[in-house]
């Protein structure tokens, strides 16, 4: 067995298992780590190590999630698995575990079930870009026609939610038999890993995306001008480049005349760094926290969007009572709260703590946003929900 060493040279990809309860997500997770460790080196994780998922807090929400890692010859994977359905809902909406692709586990003995559909819908809403299907428990189905029927149903379901159902890879396997070391079923796990490598494209790194910095603070420095500070979310800003100030007010243009970090002057600020950016020709009062600095044309301000939202339960410190249409909380984007109104789906009269729900939100000020942006719902500074922009409307 080769010594473990963390290779930074390999692309890093985030994946996870989704699907109906008891269809074998956790068993598959254990089988992947075990078979790939045996095939390519690395460490296996036992089923019970994965099933005892530790509690985590993401935006004040309690989520049980297991994280495992494994390697193929060309990539390093970080993989999340959740014990309960509610954990998946919270995980996907908060983006606590951002997935570059998901493995949808469907038991061949059952076919698609209610949570199968719900997880596909959630995947669509929160922007999981690719889904691969693992048809599990195939050792228990002798009838080839039945397997073909289940495959067809899964493809139709994926297509319903705008995933390419006809082109989605479907691997027929048995996670349990693979875990028990039966060669023909171990081969199916290696086949699945091959599809992870080939079907999920390498994710674009934050530093390669267009520049964006959420503004946290604004200062004026006499004789030099106005400085905004914040952590660069993505991309690079170079001294001398044009930037746009987006959100809350009319979009304005400026030029970056300096970048500093820890009181040192730099030529550029990069994704992940906390920097101050000096702006030419902008007055202190023309710019505020909650706006973003961005590469011109890369992001637009919007006020109305479709969202997928999780409302905290009472135990999580959320509301104790339901809310109704006409509810006007604050929506916290990046660095600031903006009041907004909501429209509930047809036939939904009220939303209870612990529910997840689709809602259309209209903000009183525009905010720089793209599909996939996460936000919190707050009442007087207290978080009562978490959400994601599923689709910008206007």
From Swiss-Prot:
Enzyme class per UniProt: hydrolase
Domain of life: Bacteria
Ranges for region G2: 60-64
Entry binding sites for Mg(2+): 26
GO molecular function per UniProt: GTP binding; GTPase activity; guanosine tetraphosphate binding; translation elongation factor activity
Reaction(s) catalysed by this chain's protein: GTP + H2O = GDP + phosphate + H(+)
Places the protein is found: Cytoplasm
Binding locations of GTP: 19-26, 81-85, 136-139
Region (G3): 81-84
Location of region: G1: 19-26
G5 as annotated region, ranges: 174-176
E.C. no: 3.6.5.3
Family: Belongs to the TRAFAC class translation factor GTPase superfamily. Classic translation factor GTPase family. EF-Tu/EF-1A subfamily.
Function: GTP hydrolase that promotes the GTP-dependent binding of aminoacyl-tRNA to the A-site of ribosomes during protein biosynthesis.
Subunit-structure text: Monomer.
Protein name: Elongation factor Tu
Source organism per UniProt: Enterobacter sp. (strain 638)
Gene that specifies this protein: tuf1
């Amino acid at each position: 067995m080769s010594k473990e060493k963390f290779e930074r040279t390999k692309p890093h990809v985030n994946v996870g298992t989704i699907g109906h309860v008891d269809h074998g997500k956790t068993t598959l997770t254990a089988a992947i780590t075990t078979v790939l460790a045996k095939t390519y080196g690395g460490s296996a994780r036992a089923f019970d190590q994965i099933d005892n998922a530790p509690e985590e807090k993401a935006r004040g929400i309690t989520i049980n999630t297991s994280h495992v890692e494994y390697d193929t010859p060309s990539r390093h994977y970080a993989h999340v698995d959740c014990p309960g359905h509610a954990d998946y809902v919270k995980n996907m909406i908060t983006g606590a575990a951002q997935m570059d692709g998901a493995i949808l586990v469907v038991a061949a003995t059952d076919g698609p079930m209610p949570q199968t559909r719900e997880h596909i819908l959630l995947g669509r809403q929160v922007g999981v870009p690719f889904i691969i299907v693992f048809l599990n428990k195939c050792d228990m189905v002798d009838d080839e026609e039945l397997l073909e029927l289940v495959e067809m149903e899964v493809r139709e379901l994926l297509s319903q939610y705008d995933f390419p159902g006809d082109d989605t890879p479907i691997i027929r396997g048995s996670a349990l038999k693979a875990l028990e070391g039966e060669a023909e079923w171990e081969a199916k796990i290696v086949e699945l890993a091959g599809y992870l490598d080939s079907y999920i494209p390498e994710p674009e790194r934050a530093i390669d995306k267009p520049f964006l910095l959420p503004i946290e603070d604004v200062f004026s420095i006499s004789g030099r001008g106005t400085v905004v500070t914040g952590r660069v979310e993505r991309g690079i800003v170079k001294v001398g480049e044009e930037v746009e100030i987006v959100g809350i007010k009319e979009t304005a243009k400026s030029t970056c005349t300096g970048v500093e970090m820890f009181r040192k002057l730099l030529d550029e600020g990069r994704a992940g760094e906390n920097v101050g950016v000096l702006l030419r020709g902008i007055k202190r009062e023309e710019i505020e926290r909650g706006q973003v600095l961005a590469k011109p044309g890369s992001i637009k301000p919007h006020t109305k969007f479709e969202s997928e939202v999780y409302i905290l339960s009472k135990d999580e410190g959320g509301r104790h009572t339901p809310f109704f249409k006409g509810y006007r909380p604050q929506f916290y984007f990046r660095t600031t709260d903006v009041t907004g109104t909501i429209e509930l789906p047809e036939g939904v009269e009220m939303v209870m703590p612990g529910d997840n729900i689709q809602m259309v939100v209209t903000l009183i000020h525009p905010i720089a946003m793209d599909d996939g942006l996460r936000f919190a719902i707050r009442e007087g500074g207290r978080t009562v929900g978490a959400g994601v922009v599923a689709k910008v409307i206007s």
